Amino acid sequence: MTNTLRGADYIAEFLVGRGVKSVFLVPGGGNMFLSDAMGQAAGLEAVPMHHEQACAMAAEAYSRVTEQVGVALVTSGPGATNAITGAGEAWAESCPLLIISGQVKRADLKGDSGLRQKGPQEVDIVEMVKGMTKYAVTVMDGQDLRYHLEKAFHLATTGRPGPVWLDVPLDIQGGPVEPAAMRGFTPPAPAAPLRAAAARMIELIN
């Protein structure tokens, strides 16, 4: 029999596996499955806040103090836009920060319809934050959760650290995923040291 679980539970278990101890959140309709999963996950403290900006700033402060990835969870629409300031702060200060936002169901996304908004409280948050994050994506397939989470953690913590953003539609949060069949993210091989090549070039020039 295939072992499945909710996408939201997979995300919570992934965070625990990466050593995350606390998630700062404001529950909402757009992230209800994720909020439930964070509250139920063993080893993970769900820290409710009064405002999404406070979530992002608290997660950024957590990152500074612990030298680990800080995690904030917000809902869709204004919940997501309220967290932008925290992402901007983490970008400027080079802090590894993961912001997870809820999103309307995939069927309610405006896509290329020409509409500015289709689903209730829908905002294209990914386009808004691309300029201040190292990685920002709306997860369109639950089986890609592992790939996006691994890539986000890798980019947040390597090179110059910084914020990353995952936008997760409601039907992926609450829908079944099969972890054993998920693809992972393989970081690109590090570039070969340039010192020897540079020395050889200088030698040829001289």
Feature map (PLM): residue ranges:
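N-terminal alpha/beta PP-like core and its mobile active-site loop of ThDP/TPP-dependent enzymes
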Residues: 1-206
